[in-house]
Amino acid sequence: MMSWAAARLTETAARCFRARCLGFRVGPWCVSQHENSSYGAAPHRTLRVSAVAFAGHNKWSKVRHIKGPKDMERSRIFSKLTLSIRLAVKEGGPNPENNSSLANILEVCRSKNMPKSTIESALKSEKNKGIYLLYEGRGPGGSSLLIEALSNSGPKCHLEIKYILNKNGGMMTEGARHFFDKKGVVVVGVEDREKKAVNLERALELAIEAGAEDVREAEDEEEEKNLFKFICDASSLHQVRKKLDSLGLCSVSCSLEFIPHSKVQLSEPELEQAVHLIQALSNHEDVIHVYDNIE
């Protein structure tokens, strides 16, 4: 049976969802917990509701995912997945039965139809001895960037990332990490196992039941499919995914990601410059992922 607190969250989240459908502006979260309540009410978990449209309808999402020829795009995705496999093997070994991070990545690889030979090559690669690097950067308009990389030469990678940043209106800086939280992210489709559509209101109810903190609408860059991202505490990632699966949702992947807790808005020229910068960083052979806090 749903608790009073959970029911209260569900009702409030639903009101926020209906308000957005009617065109009202909703803040970055709809439900919050008062830290110093004097009414003696039972404490309840905070559930944030991201007030954003699906990625395909968001200005930043439209410009940041400009894709080249399909073959080149698939090659880029496979290259980044190879880096992710190498990092997972480096941190937890080559056996997916004992390495949940690797198991999750291999699941994504199969969903992207990555060739088996490419996966096996990445698993056995001697380059798995590379160094994990996390660079902090400043982008156009005061935006913050985190650049994850895996390299066999830390100094060389550092110089090249610094050069790309400087060339495209950015710079290396300290402090960008403070704008992000490392969270668990479970990605699910917008249809359940019975092929019934799941709307945001229903996703919010399931998030409460599964123990997630946030629900965000997203889009698969390659297949242009709408998705939901359930965000949770890093330590509860696998429990949340298991619960969402048990509730009938179709999970696509789960991973740990850097999620911005404050965002910045950029002008049109700044957005264009940010696109070029992030694309240049993403094209570096050692870069796994580039995180930003652009609205």
Curated annotation (Swiss-Prot):
Coiled coil: 190-225
Keywords: Acetylation, Activator, Coiled coil, Mitochondrion, Translation regulation
GO biological process terms held by the UniProt record: mitochondrial cytochrome c oxidase assembly; motor learning; regulation of mitochondrial translation
InterPro entries (UniProt xref): Integrase-like_N, TACO1_YebC-like_2nd/3rd_dom, TACO1_YebC_N, Transcrip_reg_TACO1-like, Transcrip_reg_TACO1-like_dom3, YebC-like
Disulfide links within the chain: none
Family: Belongs to the TACO1 family.
Purpose of the protein: Acts as a translational activator of mitochondrially-encoded cytochrome c oxidase 1.
Protein name (database record): Translational activator of cytochrome c oxidase 1
